[in-house]
Amino acid sequence: AAYGRIDVLINGAGGNQAAATVAPDKTIFDLDVDAVKQVVELNLFGTILPTMVFVKAMVEQKSGSIINIASEAALRPLTRVAGYGVAKAAVINWTKYMCGELALKFGEGLRVNAVAPGFLLTNQNRDLLTNPDGSLTPRAETIIAHTPFKRFGEPEELLGTLQWLASDASKFVTGTLTVVDGGFDAFSI
């Protein structure tokens, strides 16, 4: 690489759009297929393309850790976010595919893992989860009711997992999905 080694690649492309969701007063037949394609393009190809570019340097140096950001929405169908959930599920599949592809063809120094954040309160989703007065929206209340930690995560709470996956402390870990969600995925009523 022109700028030195590339030891870690974090593929964090992500996003959704209203037209790729199914609003409460709509049905799946109202889903805008072009909007879903755009969401898949952003989330899936926003992971595939950087990998294809940066993995070449990792192959040459025989080491590197690729971490793909998936989502809780990939693990269980969440209401309204059909396109986003499908795209992030594909990111998990891509992660598992690349784990074998790289390790078998280029050696054990190349690792690929994914992280599935749960509901983290960020600027991107704040308007969906909080009212202007700071109280929780009905959707947010439902999420919190199904999260054993009874709160949203903070973006900084992903850092420990990312640091571990990027480091040699996880050098025998590849093809895995680490869920960071306060117990949301594991909890049922």
Regions found by a protein language model. Give the residues of each.
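Catalytic Tyr-X3-Lys loop
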Residues: D7, F29-I48, S63, I67, ...
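Conserved mid-core segment of classical short-chain dehydrogenase/reductases
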Residues: N16-K37, E60, R80-G83
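A glycine/serine/threonine-rich, flexible loop-to-helix segment
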Residues: A23-K26, K105-F106, F119-H146, F187-I189
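Amphipathic alpha-helical dimer-interface segment in Rossmann-like NAD(P)H-dependent oxidoreductases
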Residues: Q38-E60, C99-G100, L104, S167
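Active-site helix of classical SDR
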Residues: T51, A87, T95
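Residue(s) in the substrate-gating loop at a strand-loop-helix junction
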Residues: S71
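Short C-terminal tail/terminal secondary-structure segment
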Residues: R76, L162-Q163, T174-I189
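Short, small/polar-rich loop/turn modules that mediate ligand/substrate recognition or access, typified
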Residues: F106, R111, V173-G175
